[in-house]
Amino acid sequence: VSRAVYLTEDVPDGAFYRFRPTTWGDLSAGTLQVMTQTTGALAWVTVPNPIGTNPPTRRQVPNTKVFNGGEGTVMVGSDVVWTTKGDNRVWRYRPSTNTLRVVYNAATSSNPILSGVDNVTQLHGNLYVCEDGGDMQIVRIKPDGTVEAAVQASSITGSEITGVAFSPNGTRMFFFSQRYPGAT
């Protein structure tokens, strides 16, 4: 099992990172790496200056794989799943084989009901993705790729659904409907 913390970056030219702590459980020291891709092959390269003020971490390593507005991440077994809001995609990275695939892409989906992808969680292999805007839904992506609305909230301009989570026994879903400033 890979002992790493995976991080997204919420900018249009963002990267995908992994942090390998020197001592597992202590995040005060370790190595920050960025995903790179050349000729289809993925690799992890150490970021020279993890403080990353100038230049930012995403611009320090050649061939950094770009992700358009990284958002939520969740572990599904030993795989890492995350969303990118700029292109409405859901990604899945498998550390054991160092492979990456797109689980959902609104631009090519036969059922593009999910837009404004944001937070993601999972239960029993199903992915649950919150929409930041879109139709104000939490959308379920089943292991076979089927996409369907799981929750529909009433739409209020400027609102978003966020923070989807399940109770430890999986019988209750929780989420937050963030309202625009001034709404009650």
Map each language-model feature to its residues:
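Sequence/structural signature of beta-propeller domains
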Residues: V1-T184
